[in-house]
Amino acid sequence: MTKVTREEVEHIANLARLQISPEETEEMANTLESILDFAKQNDSADTEGVEPTYHVLDLQNVLREDKAIKGIPQELALKNAKETEDGQFKVPTIMNEEDL
């Protein structure tokens, strides 16, 4: 059985920005031990002659052909805009000069 210490659980909780009680820490340690023990079952699997795989499915970059298509006219694109300026959408400022 893999032993998970309270310190390890507290460290993981800290990394995850979680606040857990001492009772939860103990419970989490037991849960993590069970998970790690279950995962150790993979160590006993016979993988002799099994080719390593890097993806679950044997697919490679299934992409459509990149074709240029005609877009909509600028006037139609801007038709429902709340505000426009010089043929572009105008949006509220979210950063000031001092933020840069």
Curated annotation (Swiss-Prot):
Gene3D superfamilies cross-referenced by the UniProt entry: Glu-tRNAGln amidotransferase C subunit, N-terminal domain (1.10.20.60)
Record-level Gene Ontology MF annotations: asparaginyl-tRNA synthase (glutamine-hydrolyzing) activity; ATP binding; glutaminyl-tRNA synthase (glutamine-hydrolyzing) activity
Keyword Mitochondrion: no
Keyword tags: ATP-binding, Ligase, Nucleotide-binding, Protein biosynthesis
Catalytic activity: L-glutamyl-tRNA(Gln) + L-glutamine + ATP + H2O = L-glutaminyl-tRNA(Gln) + L-glutamate + ADP + phosphate + H(+); L-aspartyl-tRNA(Asn) + L-glutamine + ATP + H2O = L-asparaginyl-tRNA(Asn) + L-glutamate + ADP + phosphate + 2 H(+)
Enzyme Commission code: 6.3.5.-
SUPFAM superfamilies tied to this protein: Glu-tRNAGln amidotransferase C subunit
Protein name: Aspartyl/glutamyl-tRNA(Asn/Gln) amidotransferase subunit C
Database matches in InterPro entries: Asp/Glu-ADT_sf_sub_c (IPR036113), GatC (IPR003837)
Highest classification ranks of the organism: Bacteria, Bacillati, Bacillota, Bacilli, Bacillales
Family, similarity comment: Belongs to the GatC family.
